[in-house]
Regions:
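ABC transporter nucleotide-binding domain
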Residues: 172-262
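Short, charged/small-residue-rich alpha-helical element at the C-terminal edge
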Residues: 227-295, 299-300, 308
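Residues at or immediately preceding the N-termini of alpha-helices
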Residues: 73, 110, 217, 235, ...
Length: 308
């Protein structure tokens, strides 16, 4: 099965400065893909190139199995819904009236309006003027507009931006259910992994226009192991044995019976414990610290892809 989105060495430069740098992105069908990176990483520019709103300096984009070009752009975009930057809409009109205008422009049957209103939980507020909506309601209306016509792909640029905690939770639930409720694959951008990790299956991490990581959340977790805390009966003796084995151990000032070791493979760690026991060092406990996904994300983006 072909991916819904593929980019091949995609580049965009402004005045000679690369904003997107040889990006190879792969978004599988039927997933919610989190496109992550700090502000200014190139996420919005990439999304605009996926929609044909910005012309690449180099490389190519494939949407729904077809290379995006001027000849097929409109046909492909009819199968794509998007919410880029702030949600658009006429504030003096109701949500239903806004949706009617877009449905006519898209040549979509107006009967589809009730369906998308129900998906985003705006049915009860459909006849209120959009100017009376909260930011979260406006964001949901933007997604309803994107869903008109049952697109196969949804591209959402930071839809949780500016929302309060309740609004973020509501948006998480809505987007996480999209592949099941609408059949659409979702590409969602954010600069905060913590905001979207509960709704995505796959992640791509962008920094300075380069893709640092792409894979599942589980793969991202495995991408970095935390330090190991070793509790022993004789810390100085244990440190000396470890040094003989080429392992540098630190002694936390507030834990005199504990040594802090760098991340080690399971086999190496098991061998070290055996060596310590054979040397007469009593090993009391062993704790492998786990970095949070947010810590891994920050490490990647702050160190050009090398996890600190």
């Amino acid at each position: 099965m072909k991916p819904v989105i593929e980019t091949h060495a995609l580049c965009k430069s402004y005045h000679g400065r690369p904003v997107v740098d040889h990006l190879n992105l792969t978004v599988p069908e039927g997933c919610v893909y989190g496109f992550l990176g700090p502000n200014g990483a190139g996420k919005s520019t990439t999304m605009k190139m996926l929609l044909g709103l910005v012309h690449p300096t180099g490389g190519s984009v494939e949407l729904l199995g077809h290379t995006l070009n001027e000849a097929n752009r409109i046909a492909l975009l009819r199968q794509t819904g998007s919410l880029i930057e702030s949600p658009s809409g006429y504030l003096h009109l109701t949500a239903r009236e806004n949706l009617s205008i877009v449905a006519d422009l898209k040549d979509v049957d107006r009967k589809d309006i009730s369906r998308v209103l129900e998906i985003v939980h705006l049915t009860k507020d459909a006849d209120r003027k959009v100017g009376q909506y909260s930011l979260g309601m406006k964001q949901r209306l933007g997604i309803a507009i994107a869903l008109l016509g049952s697109p196969k792909l949804l591209i959402l640029d930071e839809p949780t931006n500016g929302l309060d905690p309740a609004g973020i939770q509501e948006m998480r639930s809505l987007i996480a259910s999209m592949p099941q409720t609408t059949g659409a694959t979702v590409l969602i951008s954010s600069h905060l992994l913590g905001e979207i990790e509960q709704m995505v299956d796959q992640v791509g991490i962008l920094s300075h226009g380069k893709l640092l990581f792409e894979g599942s959340l589980q793969q991202l977790q495995k991408h970095s192991r935390g330090d190991i805390l070793l509790r022993v009966l004789d810390a100085p003796k244990a440190a000396a044995v470890l040094q003989q084995q080429g392992v540098k151990a630190a002694a936390p000032a507030d834990q005199p019976d504990t040594l802090q070791l760098p991340p080690l493979p399971d086999e190496a760690l098991a061998a070290l414990v055996c060596t310590l026991a054979e040397s007469g060092v009593g090993v009391v406990g062993l704790t492998a610290q786990t970095k949070s996904l947010e810590d891994i994300f920050l490490s990647l983006t702050q160190t050009s892809g090398e996890v600190a």
